[in-house]
A protein has these predicted regions:
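Beta-propeller blade termini and top-face loops
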Residues: 1-279
Length: 279
Protein backbone atom coordinates (compact mmCIF):
# COMPACT_ATOMS: atom_id res chain seq x y z
CA UNK A 1 0.00 0.00 0.00
CA UNK A 2 1.48 3.29 -1.07
CA UNK A 3 -0.28 5.43 1.53
CA UNK A 4 1.16 7.61 4.29
CA UNK A 5 -1.98 7.52 6.43
CA UNK A 6 -4.79 5.08 7.20
CA UNK A 7 -8.24 6.27 8.25
CA UNK A 8 -10.12 2.99 8.65
CA UNK A 9 -9.47 -0.72 9.24
CA UNK A 10 -12.11 -3.46 9.23
CA UNK A 11 -11.95 -7.25 9.60
CA UNK A 12 -14.72 -9.40 8.13
CA UNK A 13 -16.74 -10.94 11.01
CA UNK A 14 -17.29 -14.12 9.00
CA UNK A 15 -13.68 -14.55 7.83
CA UNK A 16 -10.78 -13.08 9.81
CA UNK A 17 -8.45 -13.53 6.85
CA UNK A 18 -10.26 -10.72 5.04
CA UNK A 19 -9.11 -7.25 6.08
CA UNK A 20 -10.00 -3.89 4.55
CA UNK A 21 -8.05 -0.65 4.92
CA UNK A 22 -9.06 2.85 3.86
CA UNK A 23 -6.37 5.40 3.03
CA UNK A 24 -6.08 8.97 4.26
CA UNK A 25 -6.42 10.70 7.61
CA UNK A 26 -10.04 10.62 8.70
CA UNK A 27 -9.53 13.57 11.06
CA UNK A 28 -8.89 16.12 8.25
CA UNK A 29 -6.74 18.37 10.42
CA UNK A 30 -4.06 20.94 9.53
CA UNK A 31 -1.47 18.45 8.29
CA UNK A 32 -3.75 15.65 7.11
CA UNK A 33 -2.38 13.17 4.60
CA UNK A 34 -4.58 11.92 1.78
CA UNK A 35 -4.87 8.33 0.63
CA UNK A 36 -5.56 6.59 -2.65
CA UNK A 37 -8.63 4.51 -1.94
CA UNK A 38 -9.37 1.20 -0.28
CA UNK A 39 -7.21 -1.91 -0.06
CA UNK A 40 -8.08 -5.53 0.69
CA UNK A 41 -6.16 -8.47 2.08
CA UNK A 42 -7.42 -12.06 1.94
CA UNK A 43 -4.48 -13.51 3.88
CA UNK A 44 -4.72 -11.56 7.15
CA UNK A 45 -2.54 -8.70 5.95
CA UNK A 46 0.37 -10.49 4.30
CA UNK A 47 -0.51 -9.15 0.86
CA UNK A 48 -2.77 -6.32 -0.29
CA UNK A 49 -4.67 -5.38 -3.42
CA UNK A 50 -6.06 -1.93 -4.33
CA UNK A 51 -9.83 -2.13 -4.63
CA UNK A 52 -10.78 1.29 -5.98
CA UNK A 53 -12.11 4.68 -4.83
CA UNK A 54 -8.71 6.37 -5.38
CA UNK A 55 -10.22 9.87 -5.59
CA UNK A 56 -11.95 9.60 -2.22
CA UNK A 57 -8.69 10.74 -0.50
CA UNK A 58 -9.97 10.33 3.09
CA UNK A 59 -11.71 7.10 4.16
CA UNK A 60 -13.28 7.50 7.60
CA UNK A 61 -14.98 4.15 8.23
CA UNK A 62 -15.48 0.71 6.70
CA UNK A 63 -18.15 -1.79 7.77
CA UNK A 64 -18.56 -5.35 6.50
CA UNK A 65 -21.68 -7.51 6.36
CA UNK A 66 -21.57 -9.98 9.30
CA UNK A 67 -22.24 -13.05 7.13
CA UNK A 68 -21.34 -12.08 3.56
CA UNK A 69 -17.80 -10.61 3.34
CA UNK A 70 -18.42 -9.47 -0.23
CA UNK A 71 -20.81 -6.77 1.00
CA UNK A 72 -18.85 -3.77 2.24
CA UNK A 73 -19.78 -0.16 2.98
CA UNK A 74 -17.26 2.68 2.91
CA UNK A 75 -17.59 6.17 4.37
CA UNK A 76 -15.57 8.59 2.22
CA UNK A 77 -14.89 12.21 3.15
CA UNK A 78 -13.55 13.22 -0.26
CA UNK A 79 -10.97 15.89 -1.02
CA UNK A 80 -9.92 18.06 1.90
CA UNK A 81 -9.03 21.26 0.03
CA UNK A 82 -11.52 21.13 -2.83
CA UNK A 83 -14.90 19.78 -3.79
CA UNK A 84 -15.24 16.46 -5.59
CA UNK A 85 -17.90 13.84 -6.20
CA UNK A 86 -16.12 10.73 -4.91
CA UNK A 87 -17.46 11.17 -1.38
CA UNK A 88 -20.40 9.89 0.65
CA UNK A 89 -21.23 6.23 1.29
CA UNK A 90 -20.15 3.58 -1.21
CA UNK A 91 -21.20 -0.08 -1.33
CA UNK A 92 -19.78 -3.13 -3.03
CA UNK A 93 -21.69 -6.39 -3.39
CA UNK A 94 -18.87 -8.33 -5.05
CA UNK A 95 -15.91 -7.91 -2.74
CA UNK A 96 -14.71 -4.64 -4.24
CA UNK A 97 -14.81 -5.41 -7.96
CA UNK A 98 -17.48 -2.77 -8.48
CA UNK A 99 -18.78 0.09 -6.33
CA UNK A 100 -22.04 2.01 -6.13
CA UNK A 101 -22.41 5.40 -4.47
CA UNK A 102 -25.50 4.83 -2.34
CA UNK A 103 -25.60 7.97 -0.17
CA UNK A 104 -24.58 11.34 -1.56
CA UNK A 105 -25.73 14.90 -0.84
CA UNK A 106 -23.35 17.12 -2.81
CA UNK A 107 -19.68 17.56 -3.69
CA UNK A 108 -18.93 19.30 -0.38
CA UNK A 109 -20.40 16.77 2.05
CA UNK A 110 -18.60 13.56 3.00
CA UNK A 111 -19.37 10.54 5.16
CA UNK A 112 -17.55 10.34 8.50
CA UNK A 113 -19.06 7.31 10.27
CA UNK A 114 -20.97 4.08 9.67
CA UNK A 115 -22.48 1.33 11.79
CA UNK A 116 -24.28 -1.82 10.64
CA UNK A 117 -27.01 -3.71 12.48
CA UNK A 118 -25.50 -7.15 13.04
CA UNK A 119 -28.92 -8.75 13.60
CA UNK A 120 -30.48 -7.13 10.54
CA UNK A 121 -27.54 -6.23 8.29
CA UNK A 122 -29.70 -4.54 5.67
CA UNK A 123 -30.00 -1.73 8.22
CA UNK A 124 -27.07 0.68 8.20
CA UNK A 125 -26.65 4.06 9.88
CA UNK A 126 -24.39 6.76 8.43
CA UNK A 127 -23.15 10.15 9.61
CA UNK A 128 -22.49 12.84 7.00
CA UNK A 129 -20.10 15.72 7.59
CA UNK A 130 -20.49 19.15 5.95
CA UNK A 131 -16.86 20.27 5.84
CA UNK A 132 -14.31 21.86 3.51
CA UNK A 133 -10.83 23.20 4.23
CA UNK A 134 -10.03 26.27 2.15
CA UNK A 135 -6.66 28.08 2.01
CA UNK A 136 -8.17 31.05 3.84
CA UNK A 137 -10.91 29.40 5.90
CA UNK A 138 -11.93 26.09 7.48
CA UNK A 139 -15.60 25.29 6.89
CA UNK A 140 -16.08 22.71 9.64
CA UNK A 141 -19.85 22.66 10.04
CA UNK A 142 -23.03 23.16 8.08
CA UNK A 143 -26.69 22.22 7.65
CA UNK A 144 -25.96 19.07 5.65
CA UNK A 145 -24.22 17.27 8.52
CA UNK A 146 -26.66 14.63 9.75
CA UNK A 147 -27.53 11.04 10.62
CA UNK A 148 -29.09 8.74 8.02
CA UNK A 149 -30.58 5.25 8.06
CA UNK A 150 -31.22 2.65 5.39
CA UNK A 151 -33.35 -0.46 5.91
CA UNK A 152 -32.78 -2.05 2.51
CA UNK A 153 -29.02 -2.31 2.27
CA UNK A 154 -28.41 1.19 0.97
CA UNK A 155 -30.92 1.62 -1.84
CA UNK A 156 -32.99 4.19 0.06
CA UNK A 157 -31.86 6.44 2.93
CA UNK A 158 -33.81 8.54 5.41
CA UNK A 159 -32.35 11.49 7.28
CA UNK A 160 -33.11 11.25 11.01
CA UNK A 161 -33.94 14.68 12.39
CA UNK A 162 -36.58 14.48 15.14
CA UNK A 163 -34.91 15.79 18.30
CA UNK A 164 -31.51 16.44 16.72
CA UNK A 165 -30.21 20.00 16.28
CA UNK A 166 -29.84 21.56 12.86
CA UNK A 167 -27.86 24.49 11.53
CA UNK A 168 -24.10 24.55 12.06
CA UNK A 169 -23.38 20.92 12.89
CA UNK A 170 -19.86 19.56 12.50
CA UNK A 171 -18.49 16.10 13.02
CA UNK A 172 -20.84 13.31 14.13
CA UNK A 173 -19.91 9.98 15.69
CA UNK A 174 -22.46 7.15 15.96
CA UNK A 175 -22.70 3.70 17.49
CA UNK A 176 -25.42 1.07 17.76
CA UNK A 177 -26.17 -1.04 20.85
CA UNK A 178 -26.15 -4.41 19.11
CA UNK A 179 -27.91 -6.21 21.99
CA UNK A 180 -30.90 -3.95 21.33
CA UNK A 181 -30.40 -2.25 17.95
CA UNK A 182 -33.21 0.21 18.59
CA UNK A 183 -30.71 2.05 20.79
CA UNK A 184 -28.26 4.34 19.02
CA UNK A 185 -26.03 7.12 20.33
CA UNK A 186 -24.84 10.10 18.31
CA UNK A 187 -22.12 12.52 19.40
CA UNK A 188 -22.60 15.83 17.57
CA UNK A 189 -20.25 18.77 17.38
CA UNK A 190 -22.80 21.56 17.67
CA UNK A 191 -21.23 24.79 16.40
CA UNK A 192 -24.34 26.87 16.72
CA UNK A 193 -23.74 29.93 18.95
CA UNK A 194 -24.81 29.53 22.56
CA UNK A 195 -25.05 33.25 23.28
CA UNK A 196 -22.92 35.67 25.24
CA UNK A 197 -21.61 34.60 28.61
CA UNK A 198 -20.66 36.79 31.56
CA UNK A 199 -19.05 33.95 33.51
CA UNK A 200 -15.34 33.21 33.83
CA UNK A 201 -13.40 31.66 30.97
CA UNK A 202 -13.14 27.87 31.25
CA UNK A 203 -9.42 27.23 30.83
CA UNK A 204 -9.97 23.50 30.24
CA UNK A 205 -12.32 24.13 27.33
CA UNK A 206 -11.16 27.34 25.61
CA UNK A 207 -12.51 26.46 22.18
CA UNK A 208 -16.11 26.07 23.25
CA UNK A 209 -16.92 29.44 24.83
CA UNK A 210 -18.89 30.77 21.86
CA UNK A 211 -20.58 27.59 20.65
CA UNK A 212 -22.80 24.91 22.15
CA UNK A 213 -20.06 22.27 21.88
CA UNK A 214 -20.17 18.48 21.70
CA UNK A 215 -23.51 16.94 22.66
CA UNK A 216 -24.55 13.32 23.13
CA UNK A 217 -27.96 12.22 21.85
CA UNK A 218 -29.74 8.89 22.21
CA UNK A 219 -32.59 7.18 20.42
CA UNK A 220 -34.56 4.19 21.70
CA UNK A 221 -36.67 3.69 18.59
CA UNK A 222 -34.12 3.21 15.83
CA UNK A 223 -33.65 6.90 15.13
CA UNK A 224 -37.27 8.03 14.82
CA UNK A 225 -36.89 10.32 17.84
CA UNK A 226 -33.84 11.55 19.75
CA UNK A 227 -33.17 13.17 23.09
CA UNK A 228 -30.11 14.91 24.45
CA UNK A 229 -28.59 12.93 27.33
CA UNK A 230 -25.40 14.87 28.07
CA UNK A 231 -27.06 17.80 29.84
CA UNK A 232 -24.79 20.84 29.98
CA UNK A 233 -21.62 18.75 29.71
CA UNK A 234 -19.39 19.51 26.73
CA UNK A 235 -18.49 15.92 25.88
CA UNK A 236 -14.80 15.29 25.13
CA UNK A 237 -13.87 18.54 26.83
CA UNK A 238 -14.75 20.86 23.96
CA UNK A 239 -11.99 19.52 21.77
CA UNK A 240 -11.81 20.45 18.09
CA UNK A 241 -13.73 18.19 15.68
CA UNK A 242 -10.52 16.52 14.53
CA UNK A 243 -9.81 15.43 18.11
CA UNK A 244 -12.59 12.91 18.71
CA UNK A 245 -12.29 9.87 16.52
CA UNK A 246 -14.97 7.40 17.53
CA UNK A 247 -17.80 6.71 19.95
CA UNK A 248 -18.37 3.20 21.30
CA UNK A 249 -21.07 1.62 23.47
CA UNK A 250 -20.25 -1.17 25.89
CA UNK A 251 -21.81 -4.18 24.08
CA UNK A 252 -23.27 -5.43 27.39
CA UNK A 253 -24.30 -2.11 28.99
CA UNK A 254 -26.01 0.65 27.05
CA UNK A 255 -25.31 3.13 29.86
CA UNK A 256 -21.55 3.01 29.31
CA UNK A 257 -20.31 5.03 26.35
CA UNK A 258 -16.68 5.76 25.49
CA UNK A 259 -15.39 8.58 23.29
CA UNK A 260 -11.96 8.09 21.76
CA UNK A 261 -10.18 11.45 21.60
CA UNK A 262 -6.69 12.67 22.45
CA UNK A 263 -7.82 11.38 25.84
CA UNK A 264 -10.40 8.72 26.69
CA UNK A 265 -13.76 10.02 27.88
CA UNK A 266 -16.46 7.77 29.27
CA UNK A 267 -19.85 7.85 30.90
CA UNK A 268 -21.36 5.04 32.97
CA UNK A 269 -24.76 6.63 33.47
CA UNK A 270 -25.93 7.20 29.93
CA UNK A 271 -24.29 10.59 29.45
CA UNK A 272 -25.15 12.44 32.67
CA UNK A 273 -21.60 12.47 34.05
CA UNK A 274 -18.21 11.91 32.40
CA UNK A 275 -14.69 10.99 33.41
CA UNK A 276 -11.51 11.59 31.48
CA UNK A 277 -8.52 9.25 31.42
CA UNK A 278 -5.36 10.66 29.81
CA UNK A 279 -3.63 8.37 27.35
Amino acid sequence: MGVAAVGAVAVAPSNSQIVWVGGGDQANARSSMSGDGVFKSTDAGKTWQPMGLPDSHHIARIVIHPKNPDIVYVAAMGHLFSRNEERGVFRTMDGGKTWKKVLYVNDGVGAIDLVINLKTPTQVFAALYDKERLPWQIVESGPESGVYRTDDGGEKWTRLTSGLPGGKIGRIGIDLFQKNPLILYALLENQNPKGASTGPVNSTSPLAQGIVGNELYRTDDGGKTWRKVSGDVNVAGGKAPDSFNQIKINPFNDQQVVVNSDSMFQTRDGGKTWTMDFM
